[in-house]
C-alpha cells in the first residue's frame, strides 16, 4: 500500500524538480524555494554533499505537508538506495537500471524509477518491478518515442 500511495503522490505532483547543489545548504535552500513556489515533487541528487542529511531535513520540514514528495536521484547502487530510503526518501531515481537497487526498493516498498535507453533495459527494469521508466538521457528522444514504445515494444 505504501508504494501505491507514493506513486499517487508522484502523479499528483505532476512535475518533479531535480535538485543539485554545491553544498548541503544550497540544496536545502533550492528545495525550499521550489516548494514555496508551488511545486510538490523534489528529487534530491546524490551529487549533493551530505545528500542523506538533506533528505532527512526535507522530510522533517515537510512532514506536515502530505502533498510534498521527496525522493533521491543519481542513485548508482543498492547501498546508496538503502541509505536514501533510511533517510526518508519516498522514491529512488537512477541514471541506469540496477537489479540490486530494484530488489532493495521492492523490499522497502519504495518506487524505483531507473533511467533506461534501450528497449532491453526497459523490459528488464519492468520485469524487476520498476514502477516508472525514465528515458535517459532524455535529449536523445523525440516526442513520439513514448507512444511508439508503448504501442510496439512494451505492451
Task: Give the residues covered by each predicted segment.
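Hydrophobic, well-structured mid-protein blocks that either form specific transmembrane helices
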Residues: 79-121, 125
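Generic structural signal for well-ordered alpha-helices
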Residues: 31, 55, 81, 102, ...
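Glycine-rich beta-to-alpha transition loops that act as phosphate-gripper elements at the mouths
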Residues: 20-22, 70-78, 94-97, 114-119, ...
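Active-site/ligand-binding-proximal alpha/beta "capping" segment
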Residues: 98-100, 126-127, 131-155
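Conserved N-terminal beta1-alpha1 strand-loop-helix module at the mouth
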Residues: 1-87, 107, 127
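Short, conserved clusters of charged catalytic residues that mark active-site
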Residues: 1-2, 117, 141-144
Amino acid at each position: 500500500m505504501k508504494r501505491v500511495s507514493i506513486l499517487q503522490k508522484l502523479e499528483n505532483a505532476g512535475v518533479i524538480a531535480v535538485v543539485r547543489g554545491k553544498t548541503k545548504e544550497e540544496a536545502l535552500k533550492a528545495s525550499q524555494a521550489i516548494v514555496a513556489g508551488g511545486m510538490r515533487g523534489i528529487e534530491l541528487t546524490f551529487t549533493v554533499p551530505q545528500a542523506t542529511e538533506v533528505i532527512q531535513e526535507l522530510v522533517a520540514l515537510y512532514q506536515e505537508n502530505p502533498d510534498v514528495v521527496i525522493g533521491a536521484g543519481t542513485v548508482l547502487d543498492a547501498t546508496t538506495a538503502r541509505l536514501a530510503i533510511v533517510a526518508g526518501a519516498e522514491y529512488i531515481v537512477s541514471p541506469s537500471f540496477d537489479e540490486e537497487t530494484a530488489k532493495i526498493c521492492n523490499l522497502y516498498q519504495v518506487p524505483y524509477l531507473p533511467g533506461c535507453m534501450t528497449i532491453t533495459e526497459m523490459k528488464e527494469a519492468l520485469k524487476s518491478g520498476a514502477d516508472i521508466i525514465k528515458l535517459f538521457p532524455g535529449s536523445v528522444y523525440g516526442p513520439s518515442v513514448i507512444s511508439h514504445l508503448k504501442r510496439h515494444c512494451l505492451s
